[in-house]
Amino acid sequence: MAISAAASVSAHRLDEYLQAARIGIEPDRVDIELDLTPGADVARRLVSEIDRNRDGVLGRDETRAYTANVLRDVGLQVDDRPQALGVIDSQFPGVDAMLKGEGTIHLRLSARVSGLAAGDHRLLFLNAHHADVSAYLANALVPEGARVEVITQRRDPAQRQLEIDYVLRNAADRARPPLAPTIIGAIALLAGLAWMSKRETSRSAG
């Protein structure tokens, strides 16, 4: 689930190439779900770019080549250090669906991030793919575990750039029970023992 969605992915203009990025931050990696949906008026240009042999079918080599082009236009940094993104999965619609403005390219990207200490961190995501005809959306996803907490998100007006401030906690901090409930529980236990002792004393006296 996205923490804050700026607009509806389904509502895009026919003359735009809608690119929606959802970014998941985990302690040792960053996952990016990138959905690319060309409107009907720009789809023919995109199909021509992907279908290099003009046979009306988006072949495996052609989709791999286009995915590589997208990857070159996308950037990721953590604490001002560039991170290498790799392709986990890619799904391409049929040509007919794309020409009707109904086809979405789904890309799953991931970067391994190592050596991060507990504390504050900043992620920067950049998307410069087909900037001349594109509309962009970018949002952080709710982290899967308790070790990562997203604090703020900042976007440029076009949403080609997204900065995410987040906090990374130690695994021990995540596992350690909160101090306040522990103290309250101890006080309650002592109070109960004192009450039972007083009750037994009263019975003995009676």
What is the meaning of each model-derived region?
Residues 9-183, 193-195:
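N-terminal soluble domains immediately following signal/targeting peptides that reside
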Residues 202-206:
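Cytoplasmic C-terminal tails of single-pass
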